Amino acid sequence: MIQYDKIFIDGRWVPASSGEFSTLVNPATEEPFARVPSAFPADVDAAVQAARRAFGPWSRSTAAERKELIDAICARLTERSDELASLISQEMGIPVHFAKGIQVNGPIQGLSIFGNLAHTMEEEREENGYLVVREPIGVCAFITPWNFPLFQVIAKVGPALASGCTSVLKPSEQTPLSCFVFAEVCAQVGLPAGVFNLVTGKGSVIGEALSSHPEVDMVSFTGSTEVGVEIARAAAGGVKRVCQELGGKSPFVVAPGANVAKAIKYVVKDSMFNSGQMCVQLSRILVHEDQYEEAVEVART
């Protein structure tokens, strides 16, 4: 069984204060295969305080320094891409080749792009008679879902690293393993202590503590609308910035006279991508009543 016994706070691997662990089950085999720590609010507080201490020096680092570290992280992640694909394959129950191509290589490429954009933080511009200067927000709390575990981490942590923000990450309790590898890599390349922190556990236990923490400046969450509402409420007390990607509906419209067979085949293929678990996945088809029967028949076959 794969075991991660500690969480990553202030550049160190430390035990969760709860002393408790959760077991991960491979959806494809329905067998337990890994265990990870279950953090408590006290761990969240320690992680946020570490991020706050690190913010000053990190926000004053140069874009070139941040890009160099991001490039080093990309290189190490690439070296461990097979390992990452294996971990994600097991925790999501998906084929290894799909995990490596979509869930690993894509996010690494994305992180490299964020590194290349670090210099934009140092650019000033005049707009309508005003001087616009970019500044890092501060301490960011990131809560990510299970369907694209590493991608969602990179999409949130990557811009934070590039812009000079520090972060505390709480990944989905179902798919946290790639996040441990990410934390290991951050330590290996010499990312300053406290710039990136990892706490794992149930959202019902530590989600509110993270979203409402007075030292957190921004909360970013991807997941259900119901949970998003609770996070917004928790963050409102501190008037934090809140950035959320919640549930959605994505219709596919087949115009009258269109090639129904071609359109429906595309819809069926697209809606099954990643087992249909995407926030922008096609979820319904709107077709003219004159072509309804044809559309249903194509979808069936």
Predicted regions and their residues:
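Residue-level signal for inorganic ion chemistry
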Residues: 30, 66, 88, 111, ...
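Short gly/ser/thr-rich secondary-structure transition/capping motifs
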Residues: 120-127, 200-201, 266-267
